[in-house]
């Protein structure tokens, strides 16, 4: 059986984690072996990088330069693909990741003013050109999604409304550029309605 690689994208608070778990349960009920992971932080090295990216050094705020931030995300992604994603796909398993390279393109190129070409080139090099078979973009106005967050804001979430709006638009632009890979779903709907859209689509792939 062929491996299947699925990613979930969107600004914070749109409900990605809930839908990742729904999809995991559905596919496991179909008899598939499923690996659920996330970026940043899908490996031991990635967890250390995630802590640095989201919470700074020793819990203290740090202003990470945009190019340094891009390289940290790329390092996490390179390890993630080599250690977790590619081996699982080669075993014929399903990999579901909460964020992948599109987050770098949206948050760093769209939100932090690096060029998309720079970020995409770096990301594709880090992953050895591995793209998901399907990417679900859960789309919602950041002003609404922000109210859903139930934890203290990390460095990315506290970047401000303009940043989040630019990031949302960057995600939508990415989806428009790759319509065969992306499915854009209105995440302001109920959890059940969002899941129904995913379930209908995944049947074509799994």
Swiss-Prot record:
Coiled coil: none annotated. GO terms for cellular component: cytosol. Its EC number is 2.7.4.9. Keywords: ATP-binding, Kinase, Nucleotide biosynthesis, Nucleotide-binding, Transferase. ATP binds at residues 10-17. GO terms for molecular function: ATP binding; dTMP kinase activity. GO terms for biological process: dTDP biosynthetic process; dTTP biosynthetic process; dUDP biosynthetic process. It holds the Pfam family Thymidylate_kin. It catalyses: dTMP + ATP = dTDP + ADP. Belongs to the thymidylate kinase family. NCBIfam families: DTMP_kinase. Phosphorylation of dTMP to form dTDP in both de novo and salvage pathways of dTTP synthesis. This is Thymidylate kinase. It comes from Bifidobacterium longum (strain NCC 2705).
């Amino acid at each position: 059986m062929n491996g299947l690689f699925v990613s979930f994208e969107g600004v914070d608070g749109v409900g990605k984690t809930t839908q990742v778990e729904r999809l995991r349960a559905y596919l496991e009920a179909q008899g598939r072996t499923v690996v659920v992971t996330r970026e940043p932080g899908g490996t031991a090295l990635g967890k250390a990088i995630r802590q640095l990216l989201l919470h700074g050094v020793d819990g203290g705020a740090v202003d990470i330069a945009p190019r340094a931030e891009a390289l940290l995300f790329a390092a996490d992604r390179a390890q993630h693909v080599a250690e977790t994603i590619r081996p699982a796909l080669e075993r014929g398993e399903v990999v579901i990741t909460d964020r992948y390279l599109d987050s770098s393109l949206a948050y760093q190129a769209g939100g932090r003013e690096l060029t998309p070409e720079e970020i995409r080139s770096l990301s594709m090099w880090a992953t050895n050109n591995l793209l998901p078979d399907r990417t679900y973009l859960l789309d919602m106005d950041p002003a609404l999604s922000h109210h859903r967050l139930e934890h203290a804001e990390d460095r990315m979430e506290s970047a401000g409304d303009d940043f989040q709006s630019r990031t949302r638009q960057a995600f939508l632009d990415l989806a428009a550029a790759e319509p065969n890979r992306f499915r854009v779903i209105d995440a302001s709907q109920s959890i059940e309605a969002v899941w129904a859209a995913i379930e209908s689509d995944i049947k074509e792939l799994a």
